From Swiss-Prot:
Thermolysin slowly cleaves only the peptide bond following Cys-93. Disulfide bonds join C33-C39, C93-C98. It comes from the Bacteria. Inhibits microbial metallo-proteinases, such as thermolysin, but not serine, thiol, or carboxyl proteinases. Residues 1-29 form the signal peptide. Gene3D superfamilies: 2.60.20.30. The lineage of its organism: Bacteria, Bacillati, Actinomycetota, Actinomycetes, Kitasatosporales. Pfam families: Inhibitor_I36 (PF03995). Keywords: Disulfide bond, Metalloenzyme inhibitor, Metalloprotease inhibitor, Protease inhibitor, Signal. This is Metalloproteinase inhibitor. InterPro entries: Antimic/Inh_G_crystallin-like, G_crystallin-like. The gene is smpI. GO terms for molecular function: peptidase inhibitor activity.
């Protein structure tokens, strides 16, 4: 009887420890974005399908720009550039280094933008539409 009670208490203690681990484990982190890249996500709040654009690709494209998926709804800036974004005629653009037509905001390096200012707009990285 004493042995059964000891085993029962040990089992309860194990359950409490495992339960505590479950409750104290950190929440799942947002999808990662490789260093030196701009990542777009199809959902708001950095969720959904991810597209990775290396900063080197954006620089190589120059003023032609790199088109991102029309489904882009949020992005993480893992580059060393400050990103500016905003409506520019019919598109939302990100320009390196920081030239933007009708800029409405900017994202510092390493920052995460939970949702784009105009969902559904095409995002072009590196396209220079002038000031």
């Amino acid at each position: 009887m004493v042995r059964k009670r000891a085993l029962g208490l040990a089992g309860s203690a194990l359950t409490l420890v495992l339960g505590a681990v479950g409750f104290t484990a950190p929440a799942q982190a947002a999808p990662s974005c490789p260093a030196g890249s701009l990542c777009t996500y199809s959902g708001t709040g950095l969720s959904g399908a991810r597209t990775v654009i290396p900063a080197s690709d954006m620089e190589k494209a120059g003023t032609d720009g790199v088109k991102l998926p029309a489904s882009a709804r949020s992005f993480a800036n893992g580059t060393h550039f400050t990103l500016r974004y905003g409506p520019a005629r019919k598109v939302t653009c990100v320009r390196f280094p920081c030239y933007q037509y009708a800029t409405v905001g900017k994202v510092a390096p390493g920052a995460q933008l939970r949702s784009l200012p105009s969902p559904g707009a095409t995002v072009t990285v590196g396209q220079d539409l002038g000031d």
